[in-house]
A protein has these predicted regions:
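Bulky hydrophobic segments
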Residues: 1-96, 100, 104-121
C-alpha cells in the first residue's frame, strides 16, 4: 500500500495543474479543498500525515523507520520545490510547512510510542 500511495502522490504532485480538479470539477485549475487552510495547507498536511503513518506501519523496524522519515522529509521538500518549474503549479510556503508538519507529527508520535510503549509489539 505504501508504494502505491507513493506512486499516487508523485502523480498528483507532478501533474501540471490539478488532476483531482480535472476529475471532480472538469477544470484542471481548481484544486479540491478537504478543509479550510489555517497557517499550513490542510490538504498537504493530510496527505503527508497519511503517507507517513502508512509508511511507519509498513517499516516498523528502527533502521527502516529512520530511513523512512529521512525519505519523507526529503520528499516533502523536493516535491514542493519542483512546483517552481512545473507549469500551472506554484511553490507555496504554506504547502511546504503542511508537508513537513504531516511528517513531523507522525515522527513525534513514533518517538512517544517508542519511549512510553503505548502499543507493544
Amino acid at each position: 500500500i505504501f508504494y502505491f500511495m507513493n506512486f499516487c502522490l508523485l502523480t498528483l504532485y507532478l501533474f501540471p495543474g490539478s488532476l483531482l480538479g480535472c476529475f471532480f470539477y472538469n477544470d484542471c485549475k481548481i484544486q479540491p479543498q478537504i478543509t479550510r487552510d489555517l497557517v499550513i495547507s490542510s490538504n498537504h498536511f493530510y496527505v503527508f500525515f497519511l503517507i507517513s503513518f502508512v509508511g511507519f506501519l509498513t517499516f516498523f523496524e528502527d533502521k527502516k523507520v529512520k530511513l523512512l522519515f529521512i525519505y519523507l522529509i526529503f520528499l516533502s521538500i523536493a516535491l514542493e520545490a519542483l512546483h517552481i518549474v512545473i507549469p500551472e503549479r506554484t511553490y507555496q510556503w504554506s504547502d511546504l510547512f503542511g508537508n513537513l508538519f504531516g511528517v513531523i507529527v507522525v515522527i513525534f508520535f513514533h518517538y512517544l510510542n517508542k519511549k512510553y510503549e503505548f502499543f507493544k509489539k
